[in-house]
Amino acid sequence: MSQKQTPLKLNTFQGISIVANTMLGAGLLTLPRALTTKANTPDGWITLILEGFIFIFFIYLNTLIQKKHQYPSLFEYLKEGLGKWIGSIIGLLICGYFLGVASFETRAMAEMVKFFLLERTPIQVIILTFICCGIYLMVGGLSDVSRLFPFYLTVTIIILLIVFGISFKIFDINNLRPVLGEGLGPIANSLTVVSISFLGMEVMLFLPEHMKKKKYTFRYASLGFLIPIILYILTYIIVVGALTAPEVKTLIWPTISLFQSFELKGIFIERFESFLLVVWIIQFFTTFVIYGYFAANGLKKTFGLSTKTSMVIIGITVFYFSLWPDDANQVMMYSDYLGYIFVSLFLLPFILFFIVALKRRITTK
């Protein structure tokens, strides 16, 4: 007779890796284009720094709420604050959002792979293979996921820093000037674009029940957030500094296009975009897996569905919605809507805090 296993609790580094890997999806490949197009200046790096400080502040407030009310996951917090029925409906909408992000990441990955690697392979085959591999990892639970994510994050950072360092051979600081040439207006207008690139930060709202030491919530959430932010800033500066802002606005995948623009002769591998493609297939995969896992977890908590049933629902839903956009441009438009939902979800605990605080005060009287 098999013994019931105790669910694995995550250490701080695993928590950092989950948050960082979840954020490092399609955003890094498309952020330079989206940010430059919206701001119409090369000052996007200032926007990233500014919004980084804003989100660190919101992360801190969210950790204070978690410590004050000690909720294990946002799904339980919803039911306590809004009641079983309304909480379940909002929980279902959150699961739908998770599946929407998973679908976006899946389609973005398929578009990139088809464009750069497998031009003749039907996109449906690429998507189906990706989904099946992801579900296989999800079935193993968060324990399997948490073992892989630190390794993936380390490999990603090392390869990116090497490739970024090499790309400085075509970098021109003058392409980033003048600083604030058109004032603060373009920076304010581009803040919403940056928020969309922070997709993944909201997983911190669902991780506390899985952590060994909940008192370190702010540590793992903030460090998990800072790693992508630093990489985002480096990417933007290097891409715009090398290609110029007007050219970046015309490219769907400007980060990859940068590394296609130069070669290093006399070494074993001359085309370095191959490394970036490998890294980002991994990052698309990790983002899909964690969103799929929490969608399944939400369906289980909200409706009592089994893991098998949840995975079937996730697979079918992601496959259908990932094929919804007609082309890569529609995929990018799809991400805009997800970004607005992300901001709403990240602000939801603040509303629940006042409702739960009032209900608990009434109950204790």
Curated annotation (Swiss-Prot):
Task: Read off the InterPro entries from this record.
Answer: Spore_GerAB
Membrane topology is: Multi-pass membrane protein
Record keyword Membrane present: yes
Q: Where in the cell is it found?
A: Cell membrane
Alphabetical GO CC annotations of the entry are: plasma membrane
Transmembrane helix among the record's keywords? Answer: yes
What Pfam families is this protein classified in? Spore_permease (PF03845)
Tell me which UniProt keywords the record has, alphabetically: Amino-acid transport, Cell membrane, Germination, Membrane, Transmembrane, Transmembrane helix, Transport
- List membrane-spanning regions: 12-32, 45-65, 85-105, 122-142, 148-168, 187-207, 223-243, 250-270, 275-295, 303-323, 338-358
Per the UniProt entry, the disulfide pairs are none
**Which biological processes are named by the entry's GO terms?**
amino acid transport; spore germination
Q: Which family does it belong to?
A: Belongs to the amino acid-polyamine-organocation (APC) superfamily. Spore germination protein (SGP) (TC 2.A.3.9) family.
What the entry lists under PANTHER family is as follows: SPORE GERMINATION PROTEIN A2
Role summary = Involved in the germinative response to L-alanine. Could be an amino acid transporter. Forms a complex at the inner spore membrane which acts as a receptor for L-alanine, thus is involved in the stimulation of germination in response to alanine. Can stimulate germination in the absence of gerD and gerK gene products (fructose and glucose receptors, respectively), but the response is improved in their presence.
Descriptive protein name: Spore germination protein A2
